[in-house]
From Swiss-Prot:
Origin superkingdom: Bacteria
Free-text function comment from the UniProt entry: This protein binds specifically to 23S rRNA; its binding is stimulated by other ribosomal proteins, e.g. L4, L17, and L20. It is important during the early stages of 50S assembly. It makes multiple contacts with different domains of the 23S rRNA in the assembled 50S subunit and ribosome.
GO MF term list: rRNA binding; structural constituent of ribosome
Entries under Pfam families matching the protein: Ribosomal_L22 (PF00237)
Subunit structure, as described in the record: Part of the 50S ribosomal subunit.
Biological classification of the source: Bacteria, Bacillati, Bacillota, Clostridia, Eubacteriales
SUPFAM superfamilies: Ribosomal protein L22 (SSF54843)
Keyword terms: Ribonucleoprotein, Ribosomal protein, RNA-binding, rRNA-binding
Protein name: Large ribosomal subunit protein uL22
A GO cellular component annotation in the UniProt record: cytosolic large ribosomal subunit
Organism: Clostridium novyi (strain NT)
Length: 111
């Protein structure tokens, strides 16, 4: 049995989120909490929230044992991009892409 949690439209580049997700993929939930708590990246707070949600979903919806849970899947897909323009010299404008991500975590019980 698996439980999942998704955070959509997170105002952070998927590339930056994937760096943090790579740290916790395949780890036990308790170990992942410890890693995320001391990871000095902004994406760590987002991933921590999603992990807490996934654990709560596993406990409440599927009656899974929290101590046996591990992160089976962790991925960040690209969401819609907010396009902005920055005025530059001599009438030019540079485009700024404010990227968003959809962060998904799947937790399963270890056999």
């Amino acid at each position: 049995m698996e439980a999942r949690a998704i955070a959509k439209y997170v105002r952070m580049s998927p590339r930056k989120v994937r760096v943090v997700l790579d740290l916790v993929r395949g780890k036990n939930v308790s170990e992942a909490f410890a890693i995320l708590k001391y990871t000095p990246k902004d994406a760590a707070t987002v991933v921590l929230k999603v992990l807490k949600s996934a654990v709560a979903n596993a406990e409440n919806n599927f009656n899974l044992d929290v101590n046996k849970l591990y992160i089976a899947e962790a991925y960040a897909n690209q969401g819609p991009t907010l396009k902005r323009f920055k005025p530059r010299a001599q009438g030019r404008a540079y485009s700024i892409m404010k990227r968003t991500s959809h962060v998904t975590l799947v937790v399963k019980e270890r056999a």
